């Protein structure tokens, strides 16, 4: 169980008058809170103690200690201190039935007592997480989290990918303890298979900052996929080719079938689960090979086109990038280059036309200026003739 923690609050003091005039005795106690299974100390403080009888009783009013002498045979209770200043007892392995008021009684001519209240908290155990029904890609999964016993009622939280999920919680009180449950729903896909969902429980019985957690690994079922990997890119007559059918799916397909189009597999072929071995290749082995896998959620098939070359043939290894994609990229580059060239030619022609227009305009202006100058000169001559 968790370590005991004690929270103490001062009680109202009980003042008792002693028998003799001018004397008074005081008894003071403190309330104690402890986690179930922990250790609690119950203390009675004495003031102006004159040696009178001191009795400690449990909530059932059974005497535990009488003036320092054990009266009840419960070894969980031990007398730690008995002095004129205080009486202190120690309770180990605290239980819910130990909860209640402990009486510290001082017997004089008038009996006086004070009560120390013991409160026992129950820390939650690790939550129990269950799934309502099998999760399938594209659907929803519902998880439930249960803490059957806690006091006070535990607070439940859900986390997924370090983010809190909103759950619906409910609680039921059973005697002194609470049973708390929470449910959460969310949509799942195949990428969620193997993901972690956490249910966390907290209450005051746990140390500050601590919690009890349970991790649930998502099991999401989905249809299979298949892909064929070849042991080499270029094969020639006489080579041995190994084809591997890489299959995924949940549940994982337990049977893989190999075929070659509408023909049967070569007699030399060895099909063993995910691998197909073709030894001593010849041109007659050419064809389209397929692997097929299925589970209850779907079916998958992968293709591989086998081309067996002559031993002396010079060929390039097959690329994983389809030729159509490469051709499309090249066509796009050529188109962009043509667009750039057309734009450059158009800009050049426009700039040249603007320059010729400006030059012609300049010539017109110069002609007009020259004509004006000549006209101006003739007028001057006429003026000279007039005055002569």
Curated annotation (Swiss-Prot):
Database matches in CDD domains: IgI_2_Necl-4 (cd05885)
Gene3D superfamilies tied to this protein: Immunoglobulins (2.60.40.10)
Processing and modification events after translation: N-glycosylated.
Keywords of this entry: Cell adhesion, Disulfide bond, Glycoprotein, Immunoglobulin domain, Membrane, Phosphoprotein, Repeat, Signal, Transmembrane, Transmembrane helix, Tumor suppressor
Membrane topology, record value: Single-pass type I membrane protein
Disulfide partners: 44-104, 145-199, 245-291
Domain Ig-like C2-type intervals: 124-219, 224-307
Membrane topology, Cytoplasmic segments: 346-388
Modified residue annotations for Phosphoserine: 361
Record GO biological process: homophilic cell adhesion via plasma membrane adhesion molecules; negative regulation of peptidyl-threonine phosphorylation; negative regulation of peptidyl-tyrosine phosphorylation; negative regulation of vascular endothelial growth factor receptor signaling pathway; negative regulation of vascular endothelial growth factor signaling pathway; regulation of cell motility; regulation of cell population proliferation; regulation of Rac protein signal transduction
The Ig-like V-type domain, residue ranges: 21-119
Domain of life according to the entry: Eukaryota
Subcellular location, record wording: Membrane
Transmembrane segments: 325-345
Main location: membrane
Gene Ontology molecular-function annotations: protein phosphatase binding; receptor tyrosine kinase binding; vascular endothelial growth factor receptor 1 binding; vascular endothelial growth factor receptor 2 binding
Record family assignment: Belongs to the nectin family.
Subunit structure: Monomer and homodimer.
Biological function: Involved in the cell-cell adhesion. Has calcium- and magnesium-independent cell-cell adhesion activity. May have tumor-suppressor activity.
Protein name stated in the entry: Cell adhesion molecule 4
Organism: Rattus norvegicus (Rat)
């Amino acid at each position: 169980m968790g370590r005991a923690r004690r929270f103490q609050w001062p009680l109202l003091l009980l003042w008792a008058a002693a028998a003799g005039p001018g004397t008074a005795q005081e008894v003071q106690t403190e309330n104690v809170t402890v986690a179930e299974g922990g250790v609690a100390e119950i203390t009675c403080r004495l003031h102006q103690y004159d040696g009178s009888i001191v009795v400690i009783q449990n909530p059932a009013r059974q005497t535990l200690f009488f003036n320092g002498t054990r009266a009840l045979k419960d070894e969980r209770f031990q007398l730690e201190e008995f002095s004129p200043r205080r009486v202190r007892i120690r309770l180990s392995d605290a239980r819910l039935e130990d909860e209640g008021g402990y009486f510290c009684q001082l017997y004089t001519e008038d009996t006086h007592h004070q009560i120390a209240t013991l409160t026992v908290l129950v820390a939650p155990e690790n939550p129990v997480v269950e799934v309502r029904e099998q999760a399938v890609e594209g659907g929803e999964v519902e998880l439930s989290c249960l803490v059957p016993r806690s006091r006070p009622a535990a607070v439940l939280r859900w986390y997924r990918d370090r983010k809190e999920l909103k759950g619906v919680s409910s609680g039921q009180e059973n005697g002194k303890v609470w049973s708390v449950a929470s449910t959460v729903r969310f949509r799942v896909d195949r990428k969620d298979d193997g993901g972690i969902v956490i249910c966390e429980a907290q209450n005051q019985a746990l140390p500050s900052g601590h919690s009890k957690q349970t991790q649930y690994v998502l099991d999401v079922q989905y249809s299979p996929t298949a892909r064929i990997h070849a042991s080499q890119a270029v094969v020639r007559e006489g080579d041995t080719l190994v084809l591997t059918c890489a299959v995924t799916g949940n549940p994982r397909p337990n049977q893989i079938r190999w075929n070659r189009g509408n023909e049967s597999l070569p007699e030399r072929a060895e099909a063993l689960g995910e691998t197909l071995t073709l030894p001593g290749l010849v041109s007659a082995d050419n064809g389209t090979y397929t692997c097929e896998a299925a589970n209850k959620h779907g079916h998958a098939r992968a293709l591989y086109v086998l081309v067996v070359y002559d031993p002396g043939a010079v060929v390039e290894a097959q690329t994983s990038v389809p030729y159509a994609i490469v051709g499309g990229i090249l066509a796009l580059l050529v188109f962009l280059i043509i667009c750039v060239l057309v734009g450059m030619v158009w800009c050049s022609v426009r700039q040249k036309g603007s320059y010729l227009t400006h030059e012609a305009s300049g010539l017109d202006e110069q002609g007009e200026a020259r004509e004006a100058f000549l006209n101006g000169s003739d007028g001057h001559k006429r003026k000279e003739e007039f005055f002569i």
